Amino acid sequence: MVLEHARIGDMQGLREIWNNGGTTLGGWVSLASPVTAEVTARAGFDYVCIDTQHGAVEYSDVVAMIPAIELGGGRPIARAPWNEPGIIGKLLDAGAHGVIIPMVNTVEEARAAVRACRYAPDGARSSGPTLVQMRTDRPYFDWAHDNVACIPMIETVQAVENIDAILAVPGIDAIYVGPSDLSISLGLGPGNHDESAAFTDALDLISAACARAGVVAGIHSTGALTPDRLRRGYRMVTATGDLQAMKFGLSTELAQARGESSGAESSMY
């Protein structure tokens, strides 16, 4: 029933929003649950990302979760486990509107990411939209050309040093900062380190480079940190995820039931 009613052409695409100067706020799903995916979308996020890198999600789960997100009014994207064309192609064939691709550190790796996301002549993606073609009246080849978003991750010092060259690769729609891995690469340990000038300077350098190149700057965040990231020029910001919201909500409700202050804070992981 979900497949019957979820249609990939029924909403404005992420690329169209970005091309019109818009900002997108997203949710993150790490649990293998179409219900969780749909609930996250119904909360009102512009996109919902299914995490197949660090989440507990297999491909068969992705196939069910993508139409659930669309049914909830969201735009499904997925994070690939690695910059590997077969995996990226399968996520797109399942109906993802875009793919976040980890650990893109060089121009060569950025070109590989684009090739995996694009059909010829712009790339080398294999054509076989067996699943996704059922959910659009438009030829999927044409829809993908106009809508699929290629989103390499910037999460190391090496990637920051190469940021201008990476952004110059044709076919990149947005980049996505992984703040925890970036912090580790900076020698700060995992997490957000807004107290460190090295960390915030890197965030500002990335967003400024994106503005110059006309590429959307994206970042993993928390609800509390999202206003700061927007102020720094990030236009694709993931504000929370299913596990984080569940942990925060359960802790808060339990504290209220006990008549206590929870002291709970939202987190990225």
Regions found by a protein language model. Name each.
Residues M1-Y269:
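Expand to "…catalyze enediolate/carbanion chemistry for C-C bond making/breaking, isomerization
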